[in-house]
A protein has these predicted regions:
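Enzymes that bind and transform nitrogen-containing heteroaromatic metabolites
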Residues: 1-199
Length: 199
């Protein structure tokens, strides 16, 4: 039993380095979802995770090199993608979009670190380019379309799902993902499940 636990711990520790050896970032998917499994209300921003989970998310951001969101997340949420709740360096913003002109007034296009922008067309080339720019650990924060994009291309190494008790009568369903849960963390009213792909 002890050797099995040690083996699992070792796998988690070396996982980021194993992906770096093949020239792409270690990719962490992260989202919060309602008690019914919705990631957000349709067309509007929805606050789901509690303040303690928010602080933990900012700690994660401070530990990573880049943070990626899709076009709709920028358009609807206008996120800062920074670490304002904790000390540390802001990760470099990355945006997936085929039309950034409509996003130019958003916050992340008017800050010190200019976002790296990519289309949805060539995911492997995008990841290789990010790696060449020093993005060795990448946090994907959404939205649902963007998470689905990475899952369908089998381009994820870890998922951190914040399960909340917030209720949304309707909305956009959270991504469907299959993986092995290797850790679960209770954060006040939220529960965070850590998954990795099946071997």
């Amino acid at each position: 039993m002890i050797s099995a636990v040690k083996s699992e711990e070792g796998r988690v520790l070396i996982a980021p380095f194993s992906k770096n050896l093949i020239g792409r970032p270690y990719i962490i998917l992260k989202w919060a979802q309602s008690s019914e499994g919705y990631i957000t209300s349709k067309g509007t921003q929805s606050k789901l995770s509690n303040p303690f989970s928010d602080t933990l998310t900012h700690i994660w951001r401070s530990e990573l090199d880049g943070i990626l969101v899709g076009h709709n997340t920028v358009r609807i949420d206008n996120p800062r993608l920074d670490v304002r709740h904790v000390s540390g360096a802001n990760p470099h913003p990355v945006v997936l979009s085929n039309d950034t002109e409509s996003l130019r007034e958003s916050y992340i296009f008017n800050q010190e670190k200019v976002p790296y922008v990519y289309s949805y067309d060539h995911p492997n080339e995008m990841l290789s380019d990010l790696f060449s720019k020093g993005i060795y650990r990448l946090l994907v924060e959404g939205g649902a379309k963007t998470h689905k994009y990475f899952i369908e291309h089998n381009l994820w190494d870890e998922a951190r799902i914040i399960r909340t008790k917030v209720q949304l009568d309707k909305g956009i369903r959270s991504p469907r993902i299959q993986g092995k849960r290797y850790k679960s963390l209770k954060v006040a009213s939220d529960t965070i499940d850590y998954l990795r792909p099946f071997d």
